[in-house]
Amino acid sequence: GSGLSGSDIYRHRRWVEGEVEYYDDEWGNIWRRMVNGSTGGEVFKPALDDWRKLDGLRMPDFDNPKRYEEMAAHFAQPTDRFKMAWLPGWVFASSRYLRKMEIYFMDLIEYREEIDCLHAKVTGLLERTIRLIGKAGAEGVIFCEDLGVQDRVLIGPEMWRDVFKPH
């Protein structure tokens, strides 16, 4: 498989304060994790902490063709394997990180118009990304999405069909 090259407009930041490590992502979210307690983290400060920021939300440059040059070179090599590319997110994960998960779940009910607009922005960027991945020579995409816990989904099937199926 292959993924996107680094961004021209984003530089990853990482810093430690006491026992807590902070880092950012391309969307502008600030994450944190315990230095000696976890390898992952959780969103500490979401990029979209106020719906009034939605119109001006800075999107990652996943649709910059330069980010696909290494991928195209990789996929241009002869192989007998299926050429898969990693997609940098999906509508549910990216959107819930932008709002912070516990807020995002409330937003699904209380701020449906804003949620639909956010999902459209994220989906639009990911659609452009998929097209560029295809132009780079990928034959398929892979994305990771955590839609549930061990014994159930996080969102009921009716809401899922209404909110996410269109995207």
Spans of features found by a protein language model:
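Active-site loop segments of alpha/beta catalytic cores
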Residues: D24, R33, G56-H167
